[in-house]
Amino acid sequence: MKEKIRKKILLAPEEPGVYIFKNKGVPIYIGKAKRLSNRLRSYLNPQTEKVFRIGEEADELETIVVMNEREAFILEANLIKKYRPKYNVRLKDTDFYPYIRISDDEIPYVEIVKRKLWDGTYFGPYTSVQFVRNLLEILQKIMGFRTCKSDLKRIKRPCFLYHLGRCIGPCIGNIESHEEAIRKLREFLSGNMEEVFDYLKEKMETHSKMLDFENAAKYRDLLLNLSNVLESQGVVFEENINCDVLVHAHDLFVVLRVRNGYLVGKISFEMEGGNVEDFIREYYISGRGDIPKTLILESDLDEMDYSSLGFEYVGPPRSTTEEDLLEKAKKNLENELKMRGLRKEALEELMKLLNMKDFPYRIEGIDISHLQGKYTVASLVVFEDGFPKKGDYRRYKIEQDHPDDYESIRTVVKRRYSKHPLPNLLFVDGGIGQVNAAIEALKEIGKDCPVVGLAKKEETVVFENREIHLPHDHPVLRLLVQIRDETHRFAVSYHRKRREKESLRSVLDNVPGIGPIRKKKLIEHFGSLENIRSASLEEIARVIGSTEIARRVLDIL
């Protein structure tokens, strides 16, 4: 440790505050303390390698005195969020979690996003993308908020969602109604769901009294569908409770998110060397998770007042319901730890089986999908520490006029790894031929990486021109089968989308009056043949600007 830093530590004030270790002006560690003098003196006699490294690397120490520990806590969180020092513990997502974003436009739109970018209001994270899609679809039918990103000043006619009754139509002047829809959505996603349920019940009863049974049935179905989507998460509580439940063991943290009595998410994060206080700072104060009224913990935190952050209560359970939730969270934590143990064992077995030098922490898998050589695509999926990392998945379009899986694999491998770093292990869906194609491609770009395959028929592991037969319940085979199934699923879904778009282009080429511009408009607006078939003549005419040509489109379809 440099002498000037040692002197500054000895002169540190006894007040609460934040301290910043820097190297060449860049913060490398930011901490807080109830008494700066006591905390900083611990760096004079380091007990851990991390503390020792901070002291050795730092060439400058800055202290900021504040009024109390709460202010220190908030300032520390904001500074860490701003500078992201390398020695501060960070949350590591163990999976991809979606958010619902309401944009900060003058007339907001609503979308599902992968991560927060601080450019709107975010709700989440949620456990399942499909759950969020289903939820937003139902809520849009009820409220009518917009999901398009179009520049509303340039729109002269409403889109087909308006004509389907799913959008209020702020593009044609219904601004106040849309503002009310966005308000209701914010309230609902914040956990105040009663207003929406009461609205649907009232509408259903009103139409029933008027003998308008068709509309009464519509609101009844919306009410049932909304309840079913929320209940699909598996747990419903009679009390309209809004809380998060946080438990942790070792470096793993699990959060159960309950809104209005519905379990809307179970998420898990890894934080090396972090405690509950670190997690609250990194997850809630930095804005990764929306703040509920109540945060249930296994025990009290030391004299920290979290009310100024938005919590009404932070601490151990106060009721039987909260105790039940804590038990559920603990069971989920146990399952997560068990799964991680099994995955680690499988990866260690895989490392031994393939005689690898490095632990296969990151595995990337490739699969090819085509229809007799047409619409060829490739998928690339990523597994880290034995679990899918969906945010890193990629898709590739391959142009070829005849089926050739080997050439397709060579193409994808070269495109991927000429620009991106290699994984610890590359997985290819296929046998010796596919594996060798990947190895050849790597050699062509001057790179080397272990490549393993899984032959489809007998699920035989292929490595270095040899076949390895494993029992069906072997942990390595189970892991490779999961990777194979995921690469196949991702490839097939992209292939289907490409085939639908190409089919749409092919059909539209046969319609007199449909040139490149009109064809592009139809594809961008409808996306598939099925959507055009279900559209009205008027809607198609609005998109392409001609009723006569719209009629030709429907005639051919």
Curated annotation (Swiss-Prot):
> What GO CC terms are in its UniProt record?
cytoplasm; excinuclease repair complex
Coarsely, its chief localization is cytoplasm
A GO term for molecular function: DNA binding
**PROSITE patterns membership:** GIY_YIG, UVR, UVRC
> Which residues does the UniProt record annotate as the domain GIY-YIG?
14-89
Asked if the record carries the keyword DNA damage, the reply is: yes
Matching entries from SUPFAM superfamilies are given as:
C-terminal UvrC-binding domain of UvrB (SSF46600), GIY-YIG endonuclease (SSF82771), RuvA domain 2-like (SSF47781)
Which family is this sequence assigned to?
Belongs to the UvrC family.
> What does the function comment of this entry state?
The UvrABC repair system catalyzes the recognition and processing of DNA lesions. UvrC both incises the 5' and 3' sides of the lesion. The N-terminal half is responsible for the 3' incision and the C-terminal half is responsible for the 5' incision.
Q: How does it assemble?
A: Interacts with UvrB in an incision complex.
Q: Name it.
A: UvrABC system protein C
Q: Which organism is it from?
A: Thermotoga maritima (strain ATCC 43589 / DSM 3109 / JCM 10099 / NBRC 100826 / MSB8)
